[in-house]
Regions:
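Mid-domain catalytic core of redox enzymes
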Residues: 247-358
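Glycine-rich FAD pyrophosphate-binding loop
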Residues: 48-71
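Active-site/ligand-binding neighborhood in enzyme catalytic cores
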Residues: 151-248, 255-258, 277-279, 287
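Conserved FAD-binding subdomain of flavin-dependent enzymes
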Residues: 66, 74-105
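Mobile amphipathic helical/loop "lid" adjacent to a hydrophobic cofactor/ligand pocket
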Residues: 9, 21, 96, 101-197, ...
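Conserved flavin/dinucleotide-binding core of flavoenzymes
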Residues: 42, 50, 124, 258, ...
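N-terminal Rossmann-like FAD-binding beta1-loop-alpha1 element of flavoenzymes
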Residues: 30-56
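Extreme N-terminal leader/targeting segments of oxidoreductases
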Residues: 2-31, 49
Length: 458
């Protein structure tokens, strides 16, 4: 039998029994979706609902990608993802479609923050009085740079795209105390002040009318009732796509008439179109032919810098709920919130700006880090998922390096021949979250459906 590249037209159309490619062509899919995170699952649903034959390939043994609802301390917790909001049109549509609600945020009045070498305590009102002018200064030009967030090309953003988060922080000329207060609040969003671009934070604020308060509420306040997996499973159960778990992909080759996807086991899968819905930091592990455009390849090679961690802690005793902040690089644990009562004990959720600074499985190390905020805390147990060391994530949510928001991501959203890209990491409006993943999956699926219809008509 001849190889695909030399398979003759006659052979293809007469389906010779001894030709492996002809045998595969009988089972050609309309679309192969690679990655069953939120973007891949919703795209597979929409494509199959449009009448296309779809296969959904996932390297893990579960769907959901970087959203992951699991068990800890005898209850359900979110290891990745969690929050949604009624102002997020794409995710709200899905929640309404499947009759899934939101849980109210935990009420917390006590705030603890480490600044200028000291621990400070106050109420939410007192902390807001302190932080509001700092955040206003930090985000003040968000709408100036992104007046129409759905179209970032309307003005030249090259100046702001060159700047890092540290450039913005330095430009504010804050006192040590003020700088630490602002650094601490933003630490949940920061891995490296030097590697992350300021443009994405300003863009996020601009999508919420330049109102940083609205942005923070939407980003991390209202958990999905039943967990993110309830939503992901509801979407998948509404799909007729063929799902294959534990199926990593190594190669995606666009040969013009069809795309050949090679799995780690060596299986060849053929499709008219391929939709790559993988995390940005994983795409470099897949050989894509032909090569993508240079700005896209540069972003793939550079990866995004977010090597953060989310940690769940079981602590002895019930104590007054609090939220705590410490600046990046000044404590291994940077944000803490008392999330639940658990019998006679308490469960805390913690966010770590740099996962390499602490072993999240080391109870003593975690207790020592938490003693910055509560000196008498006794940690009983800890649990987390290391997204940085997860080969199918290699990091948490996306935050672009300087230049990538406007100079690379838009190119990645365009078709690459018969290969398309989707995911929360490259979403047009809400990159970095579930809303962006769903947005990207829906929009890209619609583009593929249109392209297939045009090909059929033409």
């Amino acid at each position: 039998a001849r190889s695909f590249l030399h398979c003759s037209r006659t052979c293809r159309y007469t389906a010779r029994r001894d030709c492996g490619v002809c045998a595969m062509s009988k089972n050609i899919y309309d679309v192969a979706v690679i990655g069953a995170g939120c973007a891949g699952v919703v795209a597979a649903r929409d494509l199959s609902s449009a009448g296309h034959k779809v296969i959904l390939l996932e390297a893990r043994d579960r769907i959901g990608g970087r959203t992951y609802t699991g068990e800890a301390f005898g209850r359900q917790v979110e290891f990745g993802g969690a929050y949604a909001h009624w102002t997020q049109s794409y995710i709200w549509r899905e929640l309404q479609r499947y009759s899934i609600g939101l849980n109210p945020p935990t009420e917390v009045d006590k705030v603890v923050w480490f600044a200028d070498g000291k621990l400070h305590t106050g109420t939410q009102v007192e902390y807001a009085t302190l932080i509001e002018p700092l955040l206003t200064a930090f985000f003040n030009d968000a709408r100036q740079w992104f007046p129409l967030p759905y179209d970032i090309s309307v003005i030249d953003t090259s100046d702001i795209e060159r700047q890092t988060l540290r450039d913005r922080l330095d430009a504010l000329n804050l006192s040590t105390y003020e700088r630490d207060v602002l650094d601490g609040l933003l630490s949940t969003l920061v891995h490296s002040w030097d590697e992350q671009g300021i443009a994405q934070l300003l863009f996020w604020a601009a999508t919420y009318f330049g109102n940083w308060g609205a942005f923070f509420e939407v980003a991390g306040s209202w958990p999905i009732a039943g967990g993110t997996q309830k939503l992901v499973r509801a979407i998948h159960n509404d799909s007729s796509a063929e799902l294959r778990l534990s199926t990593p992909v190594t190669n995606i080759d666009d040969h013009g008439e069809q795309v050949v996807i090679t799995t780690q086991s060596g299986e060849k899968i053929m499709a008219k179109k391929a939709l790559v819905a993988l995390p940005l930091n994983v795409i470099a592990d897949v050989k894509i032919t032909p090569d993508v455009k240079k700005p896209v390849q540069d972003m793939i090679d550079a990866k995004h810098p977010m090597q953060t961690a989310k940690l769940w802690v079981l602590a002895r005793g019930k104590f007054e709920p609090f939220v705590a902040f410490a600046p990046v690089e000044q404590n291994p644990i940077n944000t803490v919130r008392v999330e639940y009562e658990h019998g006679d004990d308490s469960i805390l959720v913690c966010f770590i700006s740099d996962e390499s600074t602490i072993d999240t499985n080391d109870i003593e190390a975690v207790q020592k880090a938490l003693q910055m905020f509560k000196p008498d805390i006794e940690v009983l147990d800890v649990v987390s998922h290391n997204w940085t060391k997860d080969p199918y994530a290699q990091g948490t949510w996306v935050h672009y390096r300087p230049g990538h928001l406007t100079d690379a991501a838009p190119f990645m959203r365009k078709p690459h021949g018969n290969i398309y890209f989707a995911g929360g990491d490259i979403a047009t409006m809400s990159m970095g979250g579930i809303e962006g993943a769903i947005e990207s999956g829906i929009e890209t699926a619609a583009s593929i459906t249109h392209a297939l219809a045009q090909k059929l008509a033409g």
